[in-house]
């Protein structure tokens, strides 16, 4: 057993990213990204604002189309795995006119309520099932969004800074919850985050994107559960931060977003 593969069922999707490129007009945002992500691995993607990390996640989610390169789930196109993929954003995106359990079961047909309650129980909110979203805190709303993803039994979970707006304590609690559920279910995770300490605390591997390219690919070979504030975690965090801070600090342009309609399967 290694730090990268805790004892759990590995049912995640293996990903291959080959020479991935994305251009918006005259601006090249991604410049030949190459990655291999084994099934069930937890990968954190960090980098300065505008470096291309959110664009990478959007391409994996099918929200934008690459200009060049390949996205594969195993040996098949990643588009074949869309039903097994879920995306969580920084905002929970709950429908305020639907009760919590109905938000979890959004879009489902048949007898889904028992599954929705089970998903809410997994995130500690089964007792709030019949309340309205307005009654929840920000962290609780993100738990509901996570339950909405879990009910579909995803094999690939994409997280676009879902904890960015939470207070420090709630953020740590959500990190621990996501880590526990990942260990239980074995899905592949890609987390985009600005928080390097978060990345090294919960990921198997930290990818640093620099100006649209992979600048650092760092394995986090530490046993779980990890001790926050430990010397070894601090050393890894410093290694990543030193690389980020060694780059020129010019104000970046925001990453473009394609205006074209897409087939979005967010945490729904």
Swiss-Prot record:
**Which PROSITE patterns does the protein's record reference?**
ABC_TRANSPORTER_1, ABC_TRANSPORTER_2, SSUB
| Residue sites binding ATP per the record | 47-54
Q: What kind of membrane protein is this, topologically?
A: Peripheral membrane protein
What class does this enzyme belong to in the EC scheme?
translocase
Compartment(s) of residence: Cell inner membrane
- Give EC number(s), comma-separated: 7.6.2.14
**Reactions the enzyme catalyzes:** ATP + H2O + aliphatic sulfonate-[sulfonate-binding protein]Side 1 = ADP + phosphate + aliphatic sulfonateSide 2 + [sulfonate-binding protein]Side 1
Cellular component, GO, one term:
plasma membrane
* SUPFAM superfamilies referenced in this protein's UniProt entry, alphabetically: P-loop containing nucleoside triphosphate hydrolases
Per the annotation, which location comes first and is thus the protein's main one? Answer: membrane
Q: Where is the ABC transporter domain?
A: 15-236
Keyword annotations:
ATP-binding, Cell inner membrane, Cell membrane, Membrane, Nucleotide-binding, Translocase, Transport
Assembly: The complex is composed of two ATP-binding proteins (SsuB), two transmembrane proteins (SsuC) and a solute-binding protein (SsuA).
- Please state which protein family the record places this protein in: Belongs to the ABC transporter superfamily. Aliphatic sulfonates importer (TC 3.A.1.17.2) family.
Protein purpose? Part of the ABC transporter complex SsuABC involved in aliphatic sulfonates import. Responsible for energy coupling to the transport system.
- What is this protein identified as? Aliphatic sulfonates import ATP-binding protein SsuB
